[in-house]
Amino acid sequence: VIFAFHGYRENAALMQTYSHLDEAQALVIYPDGLNQSWEGAPYAVTNGGKDREFVQDILKALTTIYPVDKDRIFATGFSNGGGFAAMIGCQMPNLFAGIAPVSAAYYSAVHENCSHTPVAMLDIHGTEDPTVAYEGGIRHNTRYDSVPEVLSQAAKRNHCQEQTSTYRINSSATRQDWHGCDLPLSHIRVGEGIHAWPGAPNDKRENVPQNMATDEVLRFFGITKVPRH
């Protein structure tokens, strides 16, 4: 099962359109956030646990209909939705096998009251994101953490060694993998990357491979795409 959370002022249908995650051999859930937002952001109307309860309710309903593998439930999301994916991975690690935030907004509330239980994590972010800066900043009068800060926290939580391996995956992006972790931790740094789901139809940069973020997220989750005939 993959939960895919849309960005602020977006909706589930748009997330489905640009992510193409339903090409995966998995049950993909595209929820709609109340007022087009998700918990953890200062503008969300669901702060206080409402969206986490919503996710749990969806899972309960799914298990009554489908033979859900409870050890293979994952979450990803874009921007505010990426921050929410990080939040539920932080606070509900026993439910999720892994998370993959993309261009995520890591407001301070995202990492409040984190469990000490490790969770597999892949972060994807563009270095020139003008909306949610790679180096952190302030939006809606609220501070959000930088990508390096978030990865440092995740490395401690997953008990990773300081050593990492970095290699180029294409002309626009590098991948960094931490060593010795209890559960995997990886980061894809998109050079000159904008605020987008990298490789989506609306990402017009020629140096970013088509469906790059989707392919990397599914690879990290260990999920293959449905074969095309």
Annotate each predicted stretch with a short phrase.
Residues 71-119, 130:
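Primarily recognizes the serine-hydrolase "nucleophile elbow" in alpha/beta-hydrolase
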Residues 123-125, 129:
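Short beta-strand/loop motif that positions the catalytic acidic residue
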Residues 129-132, 195-196:
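Acidic catalytic loop of the alpha/beta-hydrolase fold
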Residues 32-36, 105, 193:
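Short beta-to-alpha linker loops that shape the active-site pocket of alpha/beta-hydrolase fold enzymes
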Residues 20-24, 67-68, 91-94, 113-117, ...:
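Extracellular/periplasmic catalytic domains that process cell-envelope and extracellular macromolecules
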